[in-house]
Amino acid sequence: MDLTQQAKDIQNVTVEETNKNNSESIECSKITMDLKFNNSRKYISITVPSKTQTMSPHIKSIDDIVVLGMNLSKFNKLTQFFICVAGVFVFYLIYGYLQELIFSVEGFKSYGWYLTLVQFAFYSIFGLIELQPIQDKRRRIPGKTYMIIAFLTVGTMGLSNTSLGYLNYPTQVIFKCCKLIPVMLGGVFIQGKRYNVADVSAAICMSLGLIWFTLADSTIAPNFNLTGVVLISLALCADAVIGNVQEKAMKLHNASNSEMVLYSYSIGFVYILLGLTCTSGLGPAVTFCAKNPVRTYGYAFLFSLTGYFGISFVLALIKIFGALIAVTVTTGRKAMTIVLSFIFFAKPFTFQYVWSGLLVFLGIFLNVYSKNMDKIRLPSLYDLINKSVEARKSRTLAQTV
């Protein structure tokens, strides 16, 4: 653009350049021109970066949040929330059904780590495919951070899948519902967050409900094993940490969901492959799955596909609304999964499941309420007493009349 021709009608041109000491590195010079037109009262401020300033090609889309090719940044916050919630529920409900279906295959329960290996392989492929349309394919999060995230992801999904060989599926899910407890602990130690009385009460309710549910399951479930409780508890701890680490890394480096999935799961695939090779667990698993390819690899593909779509929406929730909101949404989805599990798969049932589950969800409600006290106003105890007294007076008056 010829600046001489553009400045013919300009009355004032101000050029300011600032340089620091010669010994210091030259900072980005800024040329600011105030253009005042004769027949207009408007002022135009133009900032021209110097040649030394590098312009990253992803700056224009720094706020773009793309999930499965859909740009959520075009929608308002409420619409973004409902889209993410719908995606989480639809895909993860199918995911949960397929997960229990795979472990219902006779003889498969001891191959939970191999299922995780196949799942990570599919996730890596899906992430690579989703990354192709993006022009800027540079990795933004440091490799060391991805190694940590991959390790936590392996712990979360591997231990969770393996625990199904020892636990009833609803018991595993109810443990996952209590992920808010370690998430809160992770928020305190990793991000320095502080929680109020409602959050602490929520944690207590969930803990008591979890203990009650586990005791009920141990009395009636034929395949209950304490090893499964240990495995799923370790998975919860890893899951609590990973949510906070992902939130911190994605917001700090402005990484895309597809990048997060590709690198964390591909590195995790290497971890699991090395682990299975060293423990001689790879050969028997491959032999077993080769005998039942449709019911193993076929189910695993659909299981991984729905899980990948679901995790994409979960990562979007984390990036937009934070880890705690994302966990709350996924917890509601798990409640639906428990109901569907009892409907589609035969298993023993006791009403202690219901009461303990309600106690857990009471804790979840308290946690959500603590984050939305300005929007959700519950009546105080004093208000409830006054209302009951007024109701009694009105009844007495009505009877007198």
UniProtKB/Swiss-Prot annotation:
GO CC entries: endoplasmic reticulum membrane; Golgi membrane
UniProt topology in membrane: Multi-pass membrane protein
Transmembrane segments: 78-98, 111-131, 147-167, 170-190, 200-220, 223-243, 267-287, 298-317, 324-346, 349-369
Keyword Glycoprotein attributed: yes
Compartmental location: Golgi apparatus membrane
Keyword Transmembrane helix: yes
GO molecular function, one term: antiporter activity
Glycosylation sites: N12, N71, N254
Keyword entries, A-Z: Antiport, Glycoprotein, Golgi apparatus, Membrane, Transmembrane, Transmembrane helix, Transport
Annotated signal peptide: none
Primary localisation category: Golgi
Catalytic activity of the protein: 3'-phosphoadenylyl sulfate(in) + adenosine 3',5'-bisphosphate(out) = 3'-phosphoadenylyl sulfate(out) + adenosine 3',5'-bisphosphate(in)
InterPro entries, A to Z: SCL35B1-4/HUT1
Task of the protein: Probably functions as a 3'-phosphoadenylyl sulfate:adenosine 3',5'-bisphosphate antiporter at the Golgi membranes. Mediates the transport from the cytosol into the lumen of the Golgi of 3'-phosphoadenylyl sulfate/adenosine 3'-phospho 5'-phosphosulfate (PAPS), a universal sulfuryl donor for sulfation events that take place in that compartment.
Annotated family: Belongs to the nucleotide-sugar transporter family. SLC35B subfamily.
Protein's recorded name: Adenosine 3'-phospho 5'-phosphosulfate transporter 2
Native organism: Pongo abelii
Chain's gene name: SLC35B3
